[in-house]
């Protein structure tokens, strides 16, 4: 009995020594060290994500409206008025011409009340869709990015358009007479005329970006005997490409061309064409205009009298 007691005591001491060894793991509750908070995404990634979600929201809203109009037209084509179609067209034109400052273009003030309400409803639908996609907490900071035009955020995600312009003469506003005048009425969106990232204001083409530009002008003069006799026997038919600076009021002739013609003969028809072009360094805010002599003899066709510019490269 005593021997058994001693053996049991040795067993207990041996168990205690083995349990206190460094190799035995702790059996109590484990408390892992708190992990460091995840770093916040960089602003650029957050902005890119928001722009992507914005594009998704815009696409979903536009598709929904298109499907609504389609099925509505299928059910009753007479229910969709031409006013609704014109409103969509005018709203799109308003934002397409946002970079132009000519008073003849579409502007917020020229929209009728019905179109303005449609624009506001569309804007509200886009904002609601974005809030549904990104959540109310993340959307709370979005209005700061959506200040100004309701399509500004979408435009910011696009690369800036290369500046160019091709302008054709407005035949209804050609001055009369034989004296030298500045042509102040050009088309920018009719026929072959087009403009992008440049401004047409009071007949002058304004540069919005510094750079090297290629400028060109083609002016045609013509006269038919049915139009009566020419003012004089000898005509000086000239064209001038003029640069004007707004910051420092001054004007300089960049190019000119022309000739003196005798149109007093027995010919039934007279025609003369002038074409000039060249590279020039232009600064933002400078304006290009066209001056001609004998404006009453101008050929009003879009393939005869026009001028334009396009950016070739940046200024180093």
UniProtKB/Swiss-Prot annotation:
<keyword id="KW-1003">Cell membrane</keyword>
<comment type="function">
    <text>Cytokine that binds to TNFRSF11B/OPG and to TNFRSF11A/RANK. Osteoclast differentiation and activation factor. Augments the ability of dendritic cells to stimulate naive T-cell proliferation. May be an important regulator of interactions between T-cells and dendritic cells and may play a role in the regulation of the T-cell-dependent immune response. May also play an important role in enhanced bone-resorption in humoral hypercalcemia of malignancy.</text>
</comment>
<dbReference type="GO" id="GO:0050870">
    <property type="term" value="P:positive regulation of T cell activation"/>
</dbReference>
<dbReference type="GO" id="GO:0046330">
    <property type="term" value="P:positive regulation of JNK cascade"/>
</dbReference>
<dbReference type="GO" id="GO:0043123">
    <property type="term" value="P:positive regulation of canonical NF-kappaB signal transduction"/>
</dbReference>
<dbReference type="GO" id="GO:0019722">
    <property type="term" value="P:calcium-mediated signaling"/>
</dbReference>
<dbReference type="GO" id="GO:0007254">
    <property type="term" value="P:JNK cascade"/>
</dbReference>
<dbReference type="GO" id="GO:0030316">
    <property type="term" value="P:osteoclast differentiation"/>
</dbReference>
<dbReference type="GO" id="GO:0005615">
    <property type="term" value="C:extracellular space"/>
</dbReference>
<feature type="domain" description="THD">
    <location>
        <begin position="163"/>
        <end position="312"/>
    </location>
</feature>
<dbReference type="GO" id="GO:0005164">
    <property type="term" value="F:tumor necrosis factor receptor binding"/>
</dbReference>
<dbReference type="GO" id="GO:0051466">
    <property type="term" value="P:positive regulation of corticotropin-releasing hormone secretion"/>
</dbReference>
<feature type="compositionally biased region" description="Pro residues">
    <location>
        <begin position="31"/>
        <end position="42"/>
    </location>
</feature>
<dbReference type="GO" id="GO:0048018">
    <property type="term" value="F:receptor ligand activity"/>
</dbReference>
<dbReference type="GO" id="GO:0033598">
    <property type="term" value="P:mammary gland epithelial cell proliferation"/>
</dbReference>
<dbReference type="GO" id="GO:0060348">
    <property type="term" value="P:bone development"/>
</dbReference>
<dbReference type="GO" id="GO:0071812">
    <property type="term" value="P:positive regulation of fever generation by positive regulation of prostaglandin secretion"/>
</dbReference>
<dbReference type="GO" id="GO:0060749">
    <property type="term" value="P:mammary gland alveolus development"/>
</dbReference>
<keyword id="KW-0472">Membrane</keyword>
<keyword id="KW-0217">Developmental protein</keyword>
<dbReference type="GO" id="GO:0036035">
    <property type="term" value="P:osteoclast development"/>
</dbReference>
<dbReference type="GO" id="GO:0001503">
    <property type="term" value="P:ossification"/>
</dbReference>
<feature type="glycosylation site" description="N-linked (GlcNAc...) asparagine">
    <location>
        <position position="197"/>
    </location>
</feature>
<keyword id="KW-0202">Cytokine</keyword>
<dbReference type="Pfam" id="PF00229">
    <property type="entry name" value="TNF"/>
</dbReference>
<dbReference type="GO" id="GO:0000122">
    <property type="term" value="P:negative regulation of transcription by RNA polymerase II"/>
</dbReference>
<dbReference type="GO" id="GO:0045780">
    <property type="term" value="P:positive regulation of bone resorption"/>
</dbReference>
<dbReference type="GO" id="GO:0005737">
    <property type="term" value="C:cytoplasm"/>
</dbReference>
<keyword id="KW-0325">Glycoprotein</keyword>
<dbReference type="GO" id="GO:0042802">
    <property type="term" value="F:identical protein binding"/>
</dbReference>
<dbReference type="GO" id="GO:0045672">
    <property type="term" value="P:positive regulation of osteoclast differentiation"/>
</dbReference>
<dbReference type="GO" id="GO:0034112">
    <property type="term" value="P:positive regulation of homotypic cell-cell adhesion"/>
</dbReference>
<dbReference type="GO" id="GO:0005125">
    <property type="term" value="F:cytokine activity"/>
</dbReference>
<dbReference type="InterPro" id="IPR017355">
    <property type="entry name" value="TNF_ligand_10/11"/>
</dbReference>
<keyword id="KW-0964">Secreted</keyword>
<feature type="topological domain" description="Cytoplasmic">
    <location>
        <begin position="1"/>
        <end position="48"/>
    </location>
</feature>
<dbReference type="GO" id="GO:0051897">
    <property type="term" value="P:positive regulation of phosphatidylinositol 3-kinase/protein kinase B signal transduction"/>
</dbReference>
<keyword id="KW-0221">Differentiation</keyword>
<feature type="topological domain" description="Extracellular">
    <location>
        <begin position="70"/>
        <end position="316"/>
    </location>
</feature>
<feature type="compositionally biased region" description="Basic and acidic residues">
    <location>
        <begin position="1"/>
        <end position="16"/>
    </location>
</feature>
<dbReference type="InterPro" id="IPR008983">
    <property type="entry name" value="Tumour_necrosis_fac-like_dom"/>
</dbReference>
<feature type="region of interest" description="Disordered">
    <location>
        <begin position="1"/>
        <end position="42"/>
    </location>
</feature>
